[in-house]
Amino acid sequence: MGLPWYRVHTVVLNDPGRLLSVHIMHTALVAGWAGSMALYELAVFDPSDPVLDPMWRQGMFVIPFMTRLGITNSWGGWSITGGTITNPGIWSYEGVAGAHIVFSGLCFLAAIWHWVYWDLEIFSDERTGKPSLDLPKIFGIHLFLAGVACFGFGAFHVTGLYGPGIWVSDPYGLTGKVQAVNPSWGVEGFDPFVPGGIASHHIAAGTLGILAGLFHLSVRPPQRLYKGLRMGNIETVLSSSIAAVFFAAFVVAGTMWYGSATTPIELFGPTRYQWDQGYFQQEIYRRVSAGLAENQSLSEAWSKIPEKLAFYDYIGNNPAKGGLFRAGSMDNGDGIAVGWLGHPIFRDKEGRELFVRRMPTFFETFPVVLVDGDGIVRADVPFRRAESKYSVEQVGVTVEFYGGELNGVSYSDPVTVKKYARRAQLGEIFELDRATLKSDGVFRSSPRGWFTFGHASFALLFFFGHIWHGARTLFRDVFAGIDPDLDAQVEFGAFQKLGDPTTRRQIG
């Protein structure tokens, strides 16, 4: 036929059998990719340290999605929460991956069958004998089935009635585990960080989908609406489907980037706003203050801070720090975290406690400035030593560590003090292994950043696709110069379907 690459889809325009075939093949490709990617990630994933080397630091992309739906065990004998297990059952990570690959193979065979046997009776109009689809009826069927699946997920899987539940954690991502979730029917269900809203919204949306599906199965669209929205044209279906997909992509890009109950920080890493707002820093200070109020020493109070909480309070885990074209996992950037060195507290020679001003998200370099409790600058690492008044040497700054590996260790040597002041700009200080993966020391983004960028980009692309195909179907008669109500389309000597010699070229 000699079709240009951008017109190849016209081959399924009036061919319901092969239209179905290519969609089944698309499902085969998607499921096959998901299963294969899962097996690849499992082959390279190291589950040995869920605290300092979690899945999101290792650049895992599909493992977090499996985990949030209730998969936690591997046939390799490990659990995502740490420790070993003896009976992971069929629905392990490998089991889910295998199920996707088997499903992909079955879809592949089904696609071939439907490509060969495309001319089925079910696709032909009994009155005219031509291929035709009752699109409003198909819409009703699909809406009904989607509603059943949505309701079933919310009522059974999420609630644990028949299923594992979902991943639920505390606000600081410390105690996450898979558990059953009760639906939240009150106003709290609309809080994006309340897991109960996931159950209740799926139940409500599923019920609505079932009722809407039954409505569209039992009520025919009015003739004017049918013609006005071109409901008999498959390109109308394409346009509205693209609209649904791009809308969903925009929504999930938002819930991923800003955070929600569906994107736990234990699985996808913290959000940039948690760094910007000092979210974890405030909680750490609150816990230390509570410890001091219970007559604990500073060392004891800091030693009780979970390493996991301290690790979140490190700029290297901020997804906005990764550059656009920096491929690879976070571990390939600043290295694999080995241990928390402890919290450094700086003091000048007068005994005032000094705080290092933290680096904002979008800075690559930032001046080292130490302020006192009132925000007054007391020390810095000057750019021009000749004019300095607040240098570490002049002010006599010392540093002492509390908690972590250097608990109780203090330094007064200015070179060492400046080294730790620079590192304190980046949050809590960790020992990082850059040798194992030959990490280059340049920050990378987490899967949270990749997912957001990918979905926002494709959503924008699909938005234009919706406008394009919507305009084509609504204004087809204008573009073609032909009355859409003609018995057979006459597109100035061209076939209705390019390369199809059976299409009539004129009426009669």
Curated annotation (Swiss-Prot):
Protein name as it appears in the record: Photosystem II CP47 reaction center protein
Keywords of this entry: Chlorophyll, Chloroplast, Chromophore, Membrane, Photosynthesis, Photosystem II, Plastid, Thylakoid, Transmembrane, Transmembrane helix
Membrane topology: Multi-pass membrane protein
Gene Ontology CC, one term: photosystem II
Keyword Membrane: yes
TM helices/strands, residue ranges: 21-36, 101-115, 140-156, 203-218, 237-252, 457-472
A GO biological-process term: photosynthetic electron transport in photosystem II
Native source organism of the sequence: Lactuca sativa (Garden lettuce)
Quaternary structure (record): PSII is composed of 1 copy each of membrane proteins PsbA, PsbB, PsbC, PsbD, PsbE, PsbF, PsbH, PsbI, PsbJ, PsbK, PsbL, PsbM, PsbT, PsbX, PsbY, PsbZ, Psb30/Ycf12, at least 3 peripheral proteins of the oxygen-evolving complex and a large number of cofactors. It forms dimeric complexes.
Task of the protein: One of the components of the core complex of photosystem II (PSII). It binds chlorophyll and helps catalyze the primary light-induced photochemical processes of PSII. PSII is a light-driven water:plastoquinone oxidoreductase, using light energy to abstract electrons from H(2)O, generating O(2) and a proton gradient subsequently used for ATP formation.
GO molecular function: chlorophyll binding; electron transporter, transferring electrons within the cyclic electron transport pathway of photosynthesis activity
Keyword DNA-binding: no
Principal subcellular localization: plastid
CC cofactor note: Binds multiple chlorophylls. PSII binds additional chlorophylls, carotenoids and specific lipids.
Source superkingdom: Eukaryota
Pfam families: PSII
Subcellular location: Plastid, Chloroplast thylakoid membrane
Family indicated by similarity: Belongs to the PsbB/PsbC family. PsbB subfamily.
